[in-house]
């Protein structure tokens, strides 16, 4: 059996432009040639949700990955040769265990009285990702500390990003 090479890369400002920085000339072409090797297993690791990953692949002509770790690490997909995306449910269960089997909604209730938090849009959430905005000028450190304390008091293992 030939050796395999797992190649994991971010998308934004790594493979594709995002913001004012220009894209590196020829980078996508070189990358595409590299991942054509059948020994390469390609994974995109991104904060993007599935739809945004699919849009980026289409818009920039990126190679179809074998895996996507998306939504800031809260989802893992295996992409089949047919193009079907298969959610890794064992990863969801692992996070669920870390959350003491509490749901996204349960955590929303748990954090509802903390500072100036405002829930982000529905498309920026998933069953294991809870995203908020906080008011400009608010004490981000104090808010983060309050969230961490509240989660820890419930035995919830989570990381604030």
Segments from the language model and where they lie:
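Asp-based phosphoryl-transfer active-site loop
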Residues: 2-21
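A general structural motif
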Residues: 2-4, 39, 65, 127
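Short loop/turn segments at strand-loop or loop-helix junctions that form parts
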Residues: 7-12, 71-73, 124
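Conserved strand-to-helix beginnings and helix N-cap segments that scaffold or border functional pockets
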Residues: 20-21, 54, 141-144
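Short, surface-exposed acidic/glycine-rich loop or hinge patches that mediate macromolecular interfaces
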Residues: 21, 47, 137-138
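Charged helix-capping and loop-helix junction motifs
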Residues: 24-27, 144-146
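Active-site phosphate-binding/coordination module
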Residues: 26-122
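Conserved acidic, metal-coordinating active-site core of Asp-based
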Residues: 105-161
């Amino acid at each position: 059996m030939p050796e395999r090479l797992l190649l994991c890369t971010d998308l934004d400002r790594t493979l594709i432009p995002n913001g004012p920085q220009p894209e590196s000339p020829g980078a996508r072409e070189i990358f595409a040639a590299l991942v054509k090797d059948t020994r390469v297993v390609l994974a995109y690791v991104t904060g993007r949700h599935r739809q945004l990953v699919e849009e980026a692949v289409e818009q920039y002509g990126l190679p179809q990955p074998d895996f996507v770790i998306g939504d800031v690490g809260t989802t893992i997909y295996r992409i089949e040769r047919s193009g079907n995306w298969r959610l890794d449910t064992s990863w969801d269960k692992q996070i669920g265990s870390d959350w003491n089997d509490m749901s996204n909604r349960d955590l929303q209730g748990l954090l509802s009285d903390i500072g100036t938090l405002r829930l982000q849009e529905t498309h920026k959430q998933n069953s294991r990702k809870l995203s908020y905005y906080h008011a400009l000028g608010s004490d981000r450190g104090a808010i983060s500390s309050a969230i961490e304390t509240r989660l820890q008091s419930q035995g919830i293992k989570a990381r604030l990003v």
